[in-house]
Design a protein with these regions (language model features):
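Bacterial N-terminal signal peptides
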Residues: 9-17
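A generic alpha-helix surface/boundary motif
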Residues: 63, 115-116, 194, 263
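Non-catalytic pre-domain segments flanking phosphatase-related domains
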Residues: 3, 7, 21-55, 63, ...
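A metal-dependent, Asp-based hydrolase signature
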Residues: 65-67, 72, 78-162
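Charged/polar interaction segments and conserved charged motifs
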Residues: 13, 83-102, 333-334, 341-352
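C-terminal cap/substrate-recognition subdomain and adjoining C-terminal extension
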Residues: 23-32, 36, 41-43, 48-50, ...
Length: 352
């Protein structure tokens, strides 16, 4: 009986040691970035905090929708004939020698305005069930080669190879480490919520985000048998969400709001996560789409981090200008100047 406490203590020590040994390290990060992230996590661990990440070009390399569209189009799964009539917004640019692709059509919608093509490239996958789309997403993620596509440069048809998403190993490490330390991880994507959930919440891709924590462009889902309509967002808010039971539902082209791009990302944090508690980390890669949540959400008073994936020199230049402008605006209004503080900036190759 006298040995029992000693044995219990020894077992406890072994258990703690094994937990420490199993703790995730940020091995696929530059050392200065890893140290900054480790310090932020240590300061905010197990206090009910949360982090928010963009997905395309932030959590994985390249873009899910922009590669899934030509992949499914090349397989004959998405065509002009299957496209919902509401998505035929302008005439196709056909010639005697060339029939314009839907991928090219998407590019031309972006030339009109991002506010046109951002929703369109989520809506274009309507008409399929989530189960069907999950199969195509998994096929896309397994590709080891780019997808051929065409687009217009003026009136000239150009060829393009579109890369499928490539998981950032560094980000899967960071997601895991945050969760290990009691910091909830949310995804805030300008892409289709249902499509991104198929990657972010599937354990085989390494992110392990709770399905309900994936927030994106939400489209009404339809039960083909009953005609009933719903969305994951509506179900989650009502406390009646089961991701698996939704897989037989059909994606429709009808948008739910808030729309999760530009200021809508910040609005979605307030709507779906917390109206007052700010995240201790926000990660992004696009100044216009991620800028609002990066500059307005991070709780710098807690040592919170602005995480930037520096994939384009012109975006970095734009972001530096935004830091300066926003810091000056904060100072002018007598607010704490946080816009130019606590930035962790890495290049895609450094976290691949």
């Amino acid at each position: 009986m006298k040995l029992a406490p000693k044995m219990l203590f020894a077992a406890l020590c072994v258990g703690l040691a094994s937990q420490a040994f199993a703790a995730t390290e940020l091995k696929h990060w530059p050392e200065p970035a890893a140290k900054a992230l480790d310090a932020m996590i240590a300061a905010n661990a197990n206090k009910g905090n949360y982090a928010v990440f963009d997905m395309d070009n932030t959590s994985y390399r390249f873009d899910l929708e922009e590669s899934l569209l030509p992949y499914m189009e090349n397989k004959g799964l998405i065509t002009r004939e299957t496209l919902d009539p509401s998505l035929k917004l302008m005439p196709f640019k056909d010639t005697a020698e060339h029939k314009e692709s839907l991928f090219s059509y998407y590019y031309r919608l972006c030339e009109v305005d991002d506010m046109v093509c951002y929703p369109w490239v989520a809506q274009v996958f309507s008409g399929f069930t989530l189960k069907e789309l999950k199969g195509y997403v998994d096929e896309l993620m397994a590709l080891d080669k780019p997808i051929p596509a065409t687009y217009y440069d003026g009136d000239t048809v150009k060829q393009l190879n579109v890369e499928p998403p490539r998981v950032f190993t560094g980000q899967t490490e960071l997601y895991k480490k945050l969760m290990e330390n009691g910091i909830d991880v949310y995804v805030m994507t300008a892409a289709s919520e249902e499509l991104v959930r198929m990657v972010a919440s599937d354990p085989k891709y390494g992110y392990n985000v709770k399905p309900e924590n994936v927030i994106g462009v939400s489209l009404l889902l339809k039960d083909r048998k009953t005609g009933d309509l719903t969305t994951a967002r509506k179900q989650i808010t009502a406390g009646k969400y089961d991701a698996k039971s939704n897989m037989g539902l059909e994606l429709t082209p009808y948008l739910w709001t808030p729309a999760t791009w530009m200021a809508g990302k910040q609005a979605a944090i307030l709507t779906y996560i917390d109206e007052w508690k700010k995240p201790v980390l926000v990660g992004g890669d696009t100044p216009t789409s991620d800028g609002y949540m990066l500059f307005h959400s991070v709780d710098v008073s807690k040592g919170g981090v602005h995480l930037w994936i520096n994939r384009k020199d012109k975006y970095m230049t734009q972001l530096n200008g935004m830091m300066k402008k926003n810091a000056e605006a904060q100072a002018k209004e007598g607010l704490p100047v946080t816009a130019d503080k606590n930035w962790v900036i890495v290049k895609p190759d450094e976290i691949q």
